[in-house]
Regions:
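Short acidic-glycine-tyrosine-enriched beta hairpin
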Residues: 58, 88-105
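A short, N-terminal "cap"/entry segment at the start of jelly-roll beta-barrel domains
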Residues: 2-55, 101, 133-137
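Glycine- and acidic-residue-biased ligand/ion/polar-headgroup-sensing regions
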Residues: 70-88, 98
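Short histidine-centered beta-strand/loop micro-motifs
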Residues: 64-69, 86, 111-113
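Extracytoplasmic
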Residues: 51-53, 69-72, 105, 118
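Ligand-binding loop in jelly-roll beta-barrel domains
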Residues: 91, 105-130
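A short beta-loop-beta micro-motif enriched in histidine and acidic residues
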Residues: 45, 49, 61-74
Length: 137
């Protein structure tokens, strides 16, 4: 692992800790089944590319429909038990502290199989000026 990778991983871990510490006072029954909170967005030194970080919260039983992104997605699970169905990789169950990589333009879905809220920190390295999420038809 090079120094750049180490810095990025350290930054991701720090942001994950910060995101996990942020609670919500809204009762669970009033929350959206899947909600996204954009944390940061930055241009990269690679022309036409940008990085985004988003916290995604899943209520018990909630599913994010099959979709893809115009770049890579790196997932850090903050809490709960989530099952990802990724084209070409099958189903993968992950829990708090686990990481997962979704290749660019790969359709996937995720569902919260736990009895409590599940949350992830999603880091995207994507093509700029393209929709972040494209639903499967």
């Amino acid at each position: 692992m090079n120094i750049g990778s180490t810095i990025v991983m350290g930054a991701c871990a720090g942001l994950a800790t910060l995101a996990a510490a942020c609670g919500s006072s809204t009762p669970v029954s009033e929350r959206e089944p899947v909600s996204r909170t954009d944390l940061q967005r930055h241009d990269l030194s690679i022309p036409g590319r940008e990085a985004l970080q988003t916290r995604v919260d899943f209520q018990p039983g909630a599913t994010a429909a099959r979709h893809k992104h115009p770049g890579e997605e790196i997932i850090y699970v903050l809490k709960g038990t989530l099952v990802y169905d990724i084209d070409g990789q099958g189903s993968q169950s992950v829990t708090a502290g686990d990481v997962l990589f979704v290749p660019a333009e790969t359709f996937h879905s995720v569902r919260n199989v736990g009895d409590d809220e599940g949350s992830e920190l999603a880091t995207y390295v994507v093509d700029k000026d393209k929709p972040l999420l494209v639903l499967a038809k």
